[in-house]
Structures are given as structure tokens and as C-alpha cells.
Curated annotation (Swiss-Prot):
Belongs to the D-glutamate cyclase family. Its EC number is 4.2.1.-. It is an enzyme of class 4 (lyase). One of its GO terms (molecular function) is lyase activity. It comes from Burkholderia vietnamiensis (strain G4 / LMG 22486) (Burkholderia cepacia (strain R1808)). Keywords: Lyase. InterPro entries: D-Glu_cyclase, Putative_hydro-lyase, UPF0317. SUPFAM superfamilies: PSTPO5379-like. This is Putative hydro-lyase Bcep1808_4029.
Length: 257
């Protein structure tokens, strides 16, 4: 299935699940959508936190198409699930933004680690959340983001359990793709990140971690949602964690070496 065909299946309501493993060779994107009055500070926030918030594209005020991401793409309808934040609280999840859209909204598309999972799989590195049919586990850490204006919050990480040799290979592979979070930020000790229990993720689903495996943590594009919560904007929107926008960008085009 091409990205365009996949987006049409989301738009029609035929697909409503997490997007891990979908359209493997193509980049997936996290979304943050907020009023233009705060867009400059949010852009500064992304630039200040590039590991967690690598920008793939930014829309014009009011535009629900971002051409660099896909010619027929509509960010109001092409994501399986959206989080709606009001005054910093998650108030609802919706499957379309058409009724909420405003002409001052600015779209920020942020790289997603689902993008490099295809490369890991091609190298024979098994991914537990895909094996178990679950959403990837994500955790809010104790590490503060670099603040920009009203935007701060804490770093969020995704976790994939890997054997030692696979973890080393994963570092080598993902280092080539800083536009989708790049290399892991930590391997092995959840408490060093302020994570008390791997079995209780803040977002997504818990997965099995075997005795011969290490938890491998990547910076995660859910990080901006902690910033949106802290900023307490009257209205801001993001993707539901794990339910991404699939773009026409190839993963290969994002490699830096």
C-alpha cells in the first residue's frame, strides 16, 4: 500500500489503529497544531530540543496541507486519532479535525522513530511491540526540555527491548537518521531517566522485556505534548501517541550518511 492509499484508508475510517509497521519505507510524523500567535515560540522550542523534536515540515497559518509531506495530504483527516488539549488538559480524542479547524492554526510535523523501524527489521532486529501487536511504550522522564517562551515540559522517550548485540547494531543504524530522533539517548537503566516501572508506560502499551534484553530508549515526538500541557493554551492539538501521519518522504531520503 502506498502512503497515499494508506491516508485514504484513514480518511475513510477504514483504518483507525496504531501505525507502527505501516508503509515501512516511508517516514511517519508526529503532529503539533497550535495557534499562529504561539508558533514562533514553538518553532524555537523545536530548534532548542532537536533530538526529541526534529522538524520534517511546518505549515503556513491556516493550511491543512504541508506539501513537503505529501501532495494529497490533509492533516485534518489523515491521522487515525488526534488528542485535543484545552487549557493544558487532554479533553478528547477525535478521528477528524474538520469541525475544530481554525484559520490561524499552524501545523508542525516532527520526525517519528517508527520511521527507522523498517531499517531495523531489515537487519533482522525484532521489535517487540510489533511482535505483540501493541503500541510502542512511551515514558515521561525526569529530564526537563530546554525552554522557549511558554513551552517547556519533560522529555518523553520510547522504549524497545533488545539483546546487547542488537542494541549496538540499532545505535549504528539509527545514528544515520537524526531527522527521526537518531541514536538512542540511553540504554539499560530506566531509573536514570526517572522511569520507575517499565510495565507502566505513560503512553502506549507495556511490552515484554526478557531477561537477556536491555531496554533501549529513544527521544520521542510525544515530547511536545508535555510542552503543550504545561503551556495551557486554550486549544492545541496533537496526534494520539502511536497514531501517526504517514508521509510521502522516504526514510532513505532522511539519512545523513
Amino acid at each position: 500500500m502506498t502512503p497515499s492509499e494508506f491516508r485514504r484508508s484513514v480518511r475513510s475510517g477504514a483504518f483507525r489503529g496504531p501505525t507502527a509497521g505501516q508503509c515501512g519505507p516511508f517516514a511517519q510524523a508526529n503532529l503539533a497544531i497550535l495557534p499562529n500567535a504561539h508558533a514562533h515560540d514553538f518553532l524555537r522550542f523545536c530548534h532548542a530540543n532537536p533530538k526529541a523534536c526534529p522538524l520534517l515540515g511546518v505549515g503556513e497559518p491556516g493550511a491543512f496541507r504541508v506539501d513537503v509531506l505529501g501532495a494529497d495530504l490533509d492533516v485534518r483527516t489523515d491521522v487515525p486519532s488526534y488528542n485535543v488539549y484545552r487549557d493544558g488538559r487532554l479533553t478528547e480524542r477525535v478521528d477528524s479535525l474538520e469541525a475544530l479547524w481554525r484559520d490561524d492554526f499552524v501545523v508542525f510535523a516532527i520526525g517519528c522513530s517508527f520511521s527507522f523501524e523498517d531499517m531495523l527489521a531489515r537487519e533482522g532486529i525484532a521489535l517487540r511491540h510489533i511482535e505483540e501487536g501493541r503500541n510502542v511504550p512511551m515514558y515521561r522522564t525526569s529530564i526537563p526540555n530546554r525552554r522557549a517562551g511558554i513551552f517547556g515540559g519533560q522529555l518523553v522517550v520510547s522504549m524497545r527491548p533488545l539483546r546487547g548485540a542488537d542494541a549496538i547494531r540499532a545505535v549504528q543504524i539509527t545514528s544515520r537518521f537524526p531527522g527521526v530522533h537518531g541514536a538512542p539517548i540511553h540504554i539499560g537503566h530506566p531509573r536514570a531517566l526517572g522511569i520507575a516501572d517499565l510495565g507502566a508506560p505513560d503512553f502506549g502499551d507495556a511490552v515484554t522485556v526478557r531477561d537477556d534484553e536491555l531496554p533501549v530508549f529513544w527521544a520521542c515526538g510525544v515530547t511536545p505534548q508535555t510542552a503543550l500541557m504545561e503551556a495551557k493554551l486554550p486549544l492545541a492539538i496533537a496526534h494520539t501517541p502511536g497514531y501517526m501521519l504517514i508521509t510521502d518522504m522516504t526514510n532513505a531520503s532522511l539519512a545523513v550518511f
